[in-house]
């Protein structure tokens, strides 16, 4: 695999190839340095959704999430950086009662109307991962369990890192020293 161009110019096919190579070869991947530099710089990618809006996204993790099929790690994890999907509620009661596992938003993001906003070219490249999530919700304390997701919300721990909850802080946030006491959005 030869990735000569800057990460900001990677096509979806190249993003997928980079993710696969990093998953296979880790830091020895020929694309690792470019992916890490893109993550550290906050390089944004974009694509048109099926509703005509533009989704912007960036790399937040490298070899961070376990693939749900047990075959290894997802080479790259991405995060949306704009509100192309609009403001969404977790469930009909507009709370997190029931947690992520039972949420209306999880269904909508992984197989419903929000998933269908992603172009088929992207849908075919997204690999399900296993996430550790607090499925009690309602701010009632941690009871982490596993869910399988293609698209997911980040847990507080995945962003802040200094909480005893679900998941592990993503490298993008950790490298910037983000904690719950200093995060400004």
Where are these regions (language model features)?
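Collagenous Gly-X-Y triple-helix signature in extracellular proteins
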Residues: 1-185
């Amino acid at each position: 695999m030869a990735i000569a161009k800057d990460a900001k110019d990677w096509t979806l096919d190249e993003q997928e190839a980079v993710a696969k190579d990093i998953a296979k070869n880790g830091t020895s991947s020929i694309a690792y340095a470019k992916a890490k530099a893109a993550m550290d710089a906050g390089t944004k990618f974009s694509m048109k959704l099926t509703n005509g809006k533009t989704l912007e996204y960036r790399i937040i993790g490298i070899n961070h999430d376990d693939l749900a099929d047990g075959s290894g790690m997802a080479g790259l994890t991405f995060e949306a950086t704009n509100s192309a999907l609009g403001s969404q509620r977790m469930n009909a009661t507009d709370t997190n009662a029931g947690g992520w596992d039972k949420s209306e938003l999880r269904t909508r993001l992984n197989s419903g109307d929000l998933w269908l906003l992603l172009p088929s070219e992207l849908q075919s490249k997204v690999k399900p991962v296993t996430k550790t999530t607090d499925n009690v919700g309602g701010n009632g304390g941690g009871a982490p369990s596993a869910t399988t997701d293609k698209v997911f919300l980040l847990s507080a721990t995945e962003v802040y890192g200094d909480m005893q909850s679900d998941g592990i802080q993503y490298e993008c946030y950790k490298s910037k020293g983000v904690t719950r006491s200093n995060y400004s959005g």
